[in-house]
């Protein structure tokens, strides 16, 4: 139970590993400040997956995890988008959250602050009823946050589907973006996912503040614009990068010997390939990537999942149900056995990116993976699949210069020749060297912003001070 004078913070991510992982890092950062008590509140439509439990088990024992009863989504079609399921799970968890807060209130251990993620704004109703201060931790970047804050206005002023917009959208401080590159969730305005996201973004103004997982060296213009005061815009705190930097990451066992294999490779010679906890490729695309890697002649570690026609099919459970090796081209493993290591479902990504033999990362550009690569100074090949990954790619390729973009053909398939081209460009070409230098600069920027006097540390300190003050105010009210 939280001590009366100790600020008690409850944090509640939406379902999916990509949302859970940064919230776990936020919880760890909070308890490093020994005057905070943290409770992780976990919602879902099923009991937590093995991968989720392993991440939660890595938390310090001082952080309590509370699992809410599964939300009832029996009326939601199986074809519904993952965002629909995630947002409905959050909203339909409100009764269970209310019951939890009621119980904590009786025990005098109610949190002073509730931090939800981008899909959890409906939890504000419960927070306000219990006089708990509502905040958002936006686990993506400042460019996408700016888009989310702009979405209600965009919805009012644009009548067509966004992909038909003839001019790029220009939000202050952000990379201009064409409608077809907007995040997937808004590409069909009749879909429930769009309506639910719009509903959430309209409620962002109710938050007392928004923490964003980015930093000024990476997005100086977007962060500056977000921090300009405006009506109905909460204070934005850039506190990133919040990533797992542990050299002994207990979440993920190295069952397939990735690190010992890397130990035997030359310095800066290995390309790491992973599409995150949620990404999958179609059978045809899986095959083209495999052949392209073999034909490139470069060393690689490739994390594979069984192909699927749905690119986000492993979003809620990153482990393949079928044997992914059976989908590899005949002879692929023999052809690449001297230079490649193929790993099913999951690998110790943080340690792989930190290893001196790793020289590049072919990634879906999920924000957690992007930050992990930047923190370790590893240049990127951008292969966006779903969610806001096209927007992340635009930021990294066109604005920051930290990634090369891989290009699909008109049929949507990245051909083997393109795989060979971009892999060689990163690992051999002048363009790859320039990107490598830029990422090394960003890595140095990370050290600066997270230092004692760094901008992210100061920003985090500001929000912590607000939370301490709010807890003190609550204590004074209850003592009278």
Swiss-Prot record:
CDD domains: GT1_Gtf-like. Its EC number is 2.4.1.-. GO terms for molecular function: UDP-glycosyltransferase activity. Keywords: Glycosyltransferase, Transferase. The keyword Ubl conjugation does not apply. It is an enzyme of class 2 (transferase). The keyword Transferase applies. GO terms for cellular component: endoplasmic reticulum. UDP-alpha-D-glucose binds at residues 277, 347-349, 364-372, 386-389. Pfam families: UDPGT. Belongs to the UDP-glycosyltransferase family. This is UDP-glycosyltransferase 72B2.
